[in-house]
Amino acid sequence: MPTGPAVAKPLSGEERIARLPHRVRGALRRAAPALVLYATARLVGLAVAAAVASRAHRPLWITLGDSWDSKWYTGIAQHGYGTTIAGRTPGFTYNDMAFFPLYPALQRTLATLIPLHMTVTGLVAAWLSAFAAAWGIYAVGESLHGRRTGIVLALLWGILPHAVVETMAYSESLMTALSAWSLYAVLTRRWLWAGALALLAGLTRPNAVAVAMAVLCAAGLALRRSRRDRRDWRIWASAALAPLGWLGYLSWVGSRSGGPLGYFKIQQGWGSRFDFGVSELRFLKGVFTDRDTPPHLAYYMGAAVVFAGLAALVLLVLDRPPLPVLVYSIVLVAIAIGGSKFYACKPRFLLPAFPLMLPAAIALARARPRTTAVLLPAIAVVSAAYGAYSLFYADTAP
C-alpha cells in the first residue's frame, strides 16, 4: 500500500539527449505561427526590394550580400583580418578589426560545406540567423506573457523600419538570435546555455556586451537570493562564461594594436566613440533646425526610431519585466544613442533590442482581431517600402 506520492526519477544525461529531438519538434510546432508570419513579412519585403532592384537595374543579391558592411565581412571570411583603408575624411582609418569574428567565421564555414560564392553563403548565414532570432524572440515573449504575445513580438521584429537588415549579410541577426536564446535560457534557468550563448553573442558585435551584462545580472540575483543557488556550480559557470567572447576578442585586438584599449582606438579611426549622446543631440538639432542640412529621409527615420526607442524603454520599465531583460535593453539603447557618428544606422544598432517591443506586443495581443488585421499589414507595407528605399535610394548604409 503506497504511503505517499511517487517521486519522478531524475533524467540522466543520455535520456535528456535522447529526448532532445522530441522537445525541439514540440517547441518548433508551438512557434510555427510566429515563424510563418515572420517569414511572410520578410518575403514581402524581399519581393518589394526585388521589384525596385529590377527597375534600378541592380542585382538584388549583390545589394543584400555585397554592400557596405557586407563587403568587410566577406573580406574577413575570405582573407582573414589585416585590411586597413584610409578614410575619405582626413584622419580616419578604416581597420577591419572593428568587425567581430563570429559572423564571417560562419560565412566561411558555410562556404566550405556548400559550393556557393562567399557572398551567397553570407546571405544564407544571415537568413538562418534571422529565422533563429525570430524563434528566440517568440520564445522570450511566450515565456513572459503567453503564446499570442510571443507571436506578435516575432512579427513586429520582422516589420520594423530597418527589418531589411535582417535579410542582408550583416551580423545583427546572428547577434539577436544568440542574445534572444541566451535571455530565454536565463528566464528558464538553463544557466550553462545562457552563459555559452552569451559568450558566442559576444563574438558578433561590440554592443553584444549587453547580453553578457544581462546574464551576469541574472546570476548575481540568483546567488544573492538563494543559499541553495550559491552551491550551484552552473550559475557560477554561466557568470564566468558570459563575458568571455566579448572580452576575448577585445583582448586579441589589443594584443595586435598596441594596448588593452586598441579596439576603441580602431573605432575612433572610423569616427566612432562613446560621448554619452552629445554628438547625437547635436546632429538631431542640425537635422531639424539647420537649413544648411539637406533633408534626408534616412536621418528623419533614424531620429524617429531613436525617439520611439526611448519611449518604448520607458514603457518597458513601467511593465516591470525581469531585471536581466531590462538590463539588456537599457545597455543596447545606451550604446546606440551614446555613440557618435553613423546616425542613420542607429535603428540598425537597436534591432537586437527586441524587448523594447514587448509593451506594443502585449497591447496588440490583447487588441481586437480586426485591429491587428489592419494595423500589422499596414506596418509591414511601410517597412517593405522603406527597406527598398534604404537599399536603392539612400546614400547611407542601412
Locate predicted features:
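Transmembrane-helix signature of polytopic, membrane-embedded enzymes
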Residues: H117-T121, I137-I159, W193, L323, ...
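Membrane-interface alpha helices of multi-pass inner-membrane proteins
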Residues: G158, S179-Y184, L192-C217, L241-L244, ...
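Short acidic/glycine- and proline-prone juxtamembrane loop motifs at membrane-interface regions
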Residues: M168-L174, K346-P347
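Loop-to-helix entry region of an early transmembrane alpha helix in multi-pass inner-membrane enzymes
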Residues: G91-F92, P101, A105, L113-A132, ...
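Hydrophobic, aromatic-rich transmembrane alpha-helices
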Residues: T289-D290, L297-L326, L332-A336, F354-A360, ...
